[in-house]
Amino acid sequence: MISIQSVNPNEDSFDLHSKEGVSYQISVYVPDTAPPQQGFPVLYVLDGNAFFRTFRDAVRLQARRSSKTNVLPMIVVGIGDARREDFVSERRCYDFTPPSSSLKLPKKPNGEPWSETGGADTFLAFLEETLNPQILEHYPIDTENEALFGHSLGGLFALYSLYTKPSLFSAYIASSPSLWWNERAILAKEEEFRKNLHNETLHKKLFVSIGSEEKGHMVTDAQDLAKRFSAINSSSFSFSFVEAKGENHMSVVLAVLSQSLRFISLRT
C-alpha cells in the first residue's frame, strides 16, 4: 500500500520502497486532458529530484499544441532518492552501473574511493516489479509506449536496460552516457544487442546526445556509438544522435530536451 500525496491537480508524489529496503521519491505528472483510449505514453525520468520538474514543464507547455510542437501529452514519472537531494552519489553509483566480476575505474576527482557499484540489475527489477505495477494501477498509461531517460551514469543505465531487457521500455533517451565506465565494458552488451536486433519484434527507439564541450573521451565515445547505430538498417529500430554545439555535461540536457521529446513522440 502506498500513500499518494497530491502536490497539485496534475501532480502526485509518493515514496516507494524496493524489495531491498531502498526508499525512492516518485513524482508523477498527468496531463490535464482526457487520456486516449490506449492511455497516455509515459516517460520515466532517472535522477528525478533533479530533472522531473524540467521534463514536466517541457511536456506541459509543448503538449498543449501537439500538432505544432510534435510533443504528445504524456505522463512523466520522476524517480529520485527519498532523501530529496538532486543527486545522491552513492545511490547513483550502485543503481546505474552494470554488475561485473572485475572492476577497473579511474580515480575519482576528489580522491575518495568509489562507493558500491553493480546494482543495475537490482534497479531494473525495482522498475519492472515494483514501480511499473504501481504506475499501471493508478494511472492511465499506454503499456506499449513507455520511455526511459537517464543522464551520465543514468545514460549508461538507459543503454544497459535497452541491451539487456529491451522488453521493459519502447524508447530510450541516453544523455551524455558514461560509456567509459569499467573500461567500456558496456560495449560487449551493445554488440550482443545489435547482433540480435533482427529478432526484436517490438519497435525500439534510441536517442543519444552529447555536448561538444564535454571531456574528449565522452564526445568520441558517443560519436563512435552513433556511427555504429546509424549503420543499422532495421524496421524495428529507430536511432537519433545529437551533438549539441557549445554545450557541456549539464547544459546538454536542456539544450536537446525538446528534440528528445519529439523523437519519443514519433509514431511508429
Model-inferred region functions:
Residues 1-268:
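Non-catalytic cap/lid and distal C-terminal segments of serine-dependent acyl enzymes
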